[in-house]
């Protein structure tokens, strides 16, 4: 009976085309994650600005009402 041969260094290496095919996917995933983060940051900044503007408007109304009540 023939014994199974030990895997040589050549047979254990990953095929080169597979590595090249794998890399663009990782790059695309990284760029899409970055795109999502940028969109999220823009959305949050607009939402925060709107919230701050509303709070400032409310504060101005409270101050004006207090001034009218005190005079």
Swiss-Prot record:
InterPro entries: Phage_MS2_lysis (IPR022599). It is a single-pass membrane protein. One of its GO terms (cellular component) is host cell plasma membrane. It is found in: Host cell inner membrane; Host cell outer membrane. The keyword Nucleotide-binding does not apply. Residues 1-24 are annotated as: Disordered. It comes from the Viruses. GO terms for biological process: killing of cells of another organism. Keywords: Cytolysis, Host cell inner membrane, Host cell lysis by virus, Host cell membrane, Host cell outer membrane, Host membrane, Membrane, Transmembrane, Transmembrane helix, Viral release from host cell. Its main location: host cell. The chain crosses the membrane at residues 34-56. Belongs to the Leviviricetes lysis protein family. Induces the formation of specific membrane adhesion sites between the inner and outer membranes, apparently leading to host cell lysis. Lysis may be performed via activation of host murein hydrolases. This is Lysis protein. It comes from Enterobacteria phage fr (Bacteriophage fr).
């Amino acid at each position: 009976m023939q014994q199974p041969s030990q895997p040589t260094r050549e047979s254990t290496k990953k095929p080169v085309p597979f590595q090249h095919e794998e890399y663009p996917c990782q790059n695309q995933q990284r760029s899409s994650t970055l795109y999502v983060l940028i969109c999220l940051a823009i959305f949050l900044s607009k939402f925060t600005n709107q919230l701050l503007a509303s709070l400032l408007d409310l504060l101005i109304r409270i101050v004006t009402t207090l001034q009218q009540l005190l005079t």
